[in-house]
């Protein structure tokens, strides 16, 4: 760890998100424009034009923002569920169980949903 990493570690404690998942997300988003990373929701979020598209979540899952009208269809996938934060379902947000068995293509399809939705929003 660098001194800067240690300073962050001292303030925030250990990183709670899945570093491998964050790296995979970073690769999948490499060709996107206006991508920034920010610690949010106990994880590492990837924002596009200021809007959070996907996040390597604190539970080892993928958190993504989707068109609320597509939520019911998307949660038919057994890996996906409505995201719950502090006991409240978040409209337009999904949690997707990820693990090493999830292919890059499958992960990419989920990321595409998040990217497509935030690209439909005006930049912040």
Name each region found by the language model.
Residues 1-124:
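Charge-dense, helix-prone N-terminal extensions
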């Amino acid at each position: 760890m660098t001194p800067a990493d240690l300073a962050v570690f001292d303030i925030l404690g250990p990183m709670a998100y899945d570093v491998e998942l964050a790296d995979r997300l970073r690769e999948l988003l490499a060709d996107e424009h206006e991508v920034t990373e920010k610690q949010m929701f106990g994880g590492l979020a990837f924002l596009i034009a200021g809007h959070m598209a996907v996040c390597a979540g604190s539970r080892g899952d993928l958190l993504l923002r989707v068109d609320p009208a597509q939520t019911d269809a998307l949660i038919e996938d057994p890996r996906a569920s409505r995201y719950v934060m502090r006991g409240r379902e978040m409209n337009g947000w999904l949690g997707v169980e990820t693990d090493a068995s999830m292919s890059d293509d499958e992960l990419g399809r989920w990321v595409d949903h998040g990217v497509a939705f935030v690209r439909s929003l005006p930049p912040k």
